[in-house]
């Protein structure tokens, strides 16, 4: 019986480490995106530009990123809907299988 507990304990530990790894990878990816954003900003800003021109560039970049966020939110909603539809279909198939198996 103790080996079962050890297996469960190790599986939980493995899952926890997997979640931590995914979280850390997300943080690395997010920070790389920030670095890319700042590099892009440096490419656009020139020494002879006025403050208003710089602000206009930043506002334009902000609007572009907000549009991307909106696109990702919409895509997430579509994926979630597809997952719910699949789950519903699996439940229906399971119920049909139970009813068919019960009649045999």
UniProtKB/Swiss-Prot annotation:
Belongs to the pole-localizer TmaR family. This is Pole-localizer protein TmaR. Pfam families: DUF496 (PF04363). Keywords: Coiled coil, Cytoplasm. It is found in: Cytoplasm. The lineage of its organism: Bacteria, Pseudomonadati, Pseudomonadota, Gammaproteobacteria, Vibrionales. Residues 7-34, 76-96 form a coiled coil. Its main location: cytoplasm. It comes from Vibrio parahaemolyticus serotype O3:K6 (strain RIMD 2210633). GO terms for cellular component: cytosol. Pole-localizer protein involved in the regulation of several cellular processes. The keyword Mitochondrion does not apply. InterPro entries: DUF496 (IPR007458).
């Amino acid at each position: 019986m103790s080996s079962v507990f050890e297996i469960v304990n190790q599986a939980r530990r493995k899952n926890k480490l997997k979640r931590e790894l995914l979280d850390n990878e997300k943080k690395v990816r997010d920070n790389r995106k920030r670095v890319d954003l700042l590099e892009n900003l440096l490419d656009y800003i020139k020494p002879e530009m006025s403050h208003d021109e710089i602000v206009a560039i930043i506002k334009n970049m902000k609007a572009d990123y907000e549009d991307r966020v909106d696109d990702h939110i919409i895509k997430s909603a579509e994926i979630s809907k597809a997952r719910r539809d699949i789950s519903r279909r699996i439940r229906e198939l399971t119920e049909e299988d139970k009813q068919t198996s019960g009649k045999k």
